[in-house]
């Protein structure tokens, strides 16, 4: 039985939890060897029994049978396509149509958003928002795709009146870090949590008495250990992959939550500043 095909064809009939399971299995099919029903249930925020019932609905006796069948289907598919198709990104290959690529990318991003939001500690997030709101000065650090996420957050925060530095040059990042003071905040964005440039800046910020907030993965990392607060992001991408699409999606979901939370704390004045910004930029057209 071709379970992957069956999953795709039955998507319109799935309940909310069943759709979560289907999306996970399709996005993570290449990694199912290391996935248990318990681990999957925790990541998706559902019960193990829901996963077993989903497997049975597809005709398998349980999750183990479904998992092994999917692994076999994936391996057979890879053997068939390896001779002609190049592996481009995640589950996307060079012989996928644009429509298939769009579906795969959409599923990957949705999964990153769902898992990140499901695993966030919202009490901790609220505390972090309060800490940022009181900071005289905020520094945001990041490299590559994480730097783009940081730059976007910096623009949003400046729009509502916060003093923010977000420089792409790592030497400038380090220079700003050593000048931070007690009460200031450094937001360090790094999925791996192991980039030496980001760690150097975090160490300098801590030494100066600033509060370090890390937006990083669940992996135990040097940055996680350095930070006063962490906000976890979940992505299906690994260190060797050439792009960080779902990682940026997960990071942006967290930074957008920070921004909206800060707007809420000072909603009237924040909305006035956003409106003034809009009026000014309209005059530039």
UniProtKB/Swiss-Prot annotation:
Gene3D superfamilies the UniProt entry points to: Glucose-6-phosphate isomerase like protein, domain 1 (3.40.50.10490), Winged helix-like DNA-binding domain superfamily/Winged helix DNA-binding domain (1.10.10.10)
Keyword presence, Magnesium: no
Domain SIS, first and last residues per copy: 128-268
Pathway: Amino-sugar metabolism; N-acetylmuramate degradation [regulation]
Family matches, as Pfam families: HTH_6 (PF01418), SIS (PF01380)
Keyword Transcription set for record: yes
DNA-binding region: 37-56
Domain HTH rpiR-type as annotated: residue spans: 1-77
Keywords: Carbohydrate metabolism, DNA-binding, Repressor, Transcription, Transcription regulation
One GO term (biological process): carbohydrate derivative metabolic process
Gene Ontology MF terms: carbohydrate derivative binding; DNA binding; DNA-binding transcription factor activity
Regions annotated as coiled coil: none
Listed HAMAP family: HTH_type_MurR
Subunit structure: Homotetramer.
Functional note: Represses the expression of the murPQ operon involved in the uptake and degradation of N-acetylmuramic acid (MurNAc). Binds to two adjacent inverted repeats within the operator region. MurNAc 6-phosphate, the substrate of MurQ, is the specific inducer that weakens binding of MurR to the operator.
Entry protein name: HTH-type transcriptional regulator MurR
């Amino acid at each position: 039985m071709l379970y992957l095909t069956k999953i795709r064809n039955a998507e319109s009939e799935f309940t909310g939890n069943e759709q979560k399971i289907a999306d996970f299995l399709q996005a993570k099919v290449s990694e199912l060897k290391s996935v248990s029903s318990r681990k999957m249930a925790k990541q998706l925020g559902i019960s193990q029994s829901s996963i077993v019932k989903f497997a049975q609905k597809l005709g398998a006796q349980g999750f183990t049978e479904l998992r092994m069948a999917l692994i076999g289907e994936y391996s057979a598919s890879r053997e068939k396509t390896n001779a002609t198709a190049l592996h481009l990104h995640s589950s996307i290959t060079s012989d996928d149509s644009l429509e298939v690529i769009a579906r795969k990318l959409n599923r990957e991003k949705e999964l990153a958003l769902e898992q990140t939001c499901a695993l966030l500690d919202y009490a901790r997030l609220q505390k972090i928002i309060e800490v940022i709101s009181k900071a005289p000065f905020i520094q945001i650090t990041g490299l590559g795709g994480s730097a783009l996420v940081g730059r976007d957050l910096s623009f949003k925060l400046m729009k509502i009146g916060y003093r923010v530095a977000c420089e792409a040059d790592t030497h400038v990042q380090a220079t700003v870090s050593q000048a931070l003071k007690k009460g200031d905040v450094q937001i360090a964005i790094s999925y791996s949590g192991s980039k030496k440039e980001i760690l150097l800046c975090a160490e300098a910020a801590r030494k100066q008495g600033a509060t370090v907030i890390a937006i990083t993965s669940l992996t135990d990392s040097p940055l996680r250990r350095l930070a006063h607060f962490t906000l976890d992001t979940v992505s299906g991408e690994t260190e060797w992959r050439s792009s960080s699409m779902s990682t940026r999606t997960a990071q942006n979901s967290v930074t957008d939550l920070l921004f909206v939370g800060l707007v809420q704390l000072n909603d009237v004045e924040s909305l006035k500043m956003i409106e003034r910004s809009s009026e000014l930029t309209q005059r530039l057209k």
